[in-house]
């Protein structure tokens, strides 16, 4: 219940419960652009089916929330918290995820590279730690590279679709989806193959400032 209330407060501040409907964001690349690491079939299903379902269900939950608030129906407001957390988190997480991926791959540079070297010793160390912790997620969830307000980078995992910032306070920089729909058609049950450090090189050249703005966009109606 405390987590649900915390999520509700953060989501409200972020503009997640706004009146216009959330929409599925366009991808900045074709479905086949990430092959062979991620197949076109997985990308098409993941984006147009799974993410779209989170968007649809989030809109339904927000409509029910608005009705309950107008009626002063506190019981219904409370009962909607899990749906808002799950579908709102799914929408936020995937909106960040698509922007993290790059057809050309690439390595961190500039401000982000300096922060990674400071906090992990090297990019390779960061990738290895991120891969190991993400592979170890039990069931469905996400692995994240994020940072705290002071700027220190941390690796964290979240179960299901729990959004990183609302759950841990970390601002998300780079996320890895380890729900089976993200890899099973291609990698079957061998999750670790997808998460070997060479696969994580799909990470683009992102900056701390750019990623902060990306996270803010992912929680707004206009950016969704």
UniProtKB/Swiss-Prot annotation:
Keywords: Manganese, Metal-binding, Mitochondrion, Oxidoreductase, Transit peptide
Name of the protein in question: Superoxide dismutase [Mn], mitochondrial
Enzyme Commission number(s) of this protein: 1.15.1.1
Family as reported in the entry's similarity comment: Belongs to the iron/manganese superoxide dismutase family.
Domain of life where this protein originates: Eukaryota
Catalysed reaction equations from the record: 2 superoxide + 2 H(+) = H2O2 + O2
GO terms for cellular component: mitochondrial matrix
UniProt entry tagged with the keyword Cytoplasm: no
UniProt GO molecular function: manganese ion binding; superoxide dismutase activity
Database matches in InterPro entries: Fe/Mn_Superoxide_Dismutase (IPR050265), Mn/Fe_SOD (IPR001189), Mn/Fe_SOD_BS (IPR019833), Mn/Fe_SOD_C (IPR019832), Mn/Fe_SOD_N (IPR019831), Mn/Fe_SOD_N_sf (IPR036324), SOD_C_sf (IPR036314)
Broad enzyme group: oxidoreductase
Organism: Charybdis feriata (Crucifix crab)
Binding site for Mn(2+): 46, 94, 177, 181
Cofactor, free-text remark: Binds 1 Mn(2+) ion per subunit.
Principal localisation: mitochondrion
Subcellular location per the Swiss-Prot or TrEMBL entry: Mitochondrion matrix
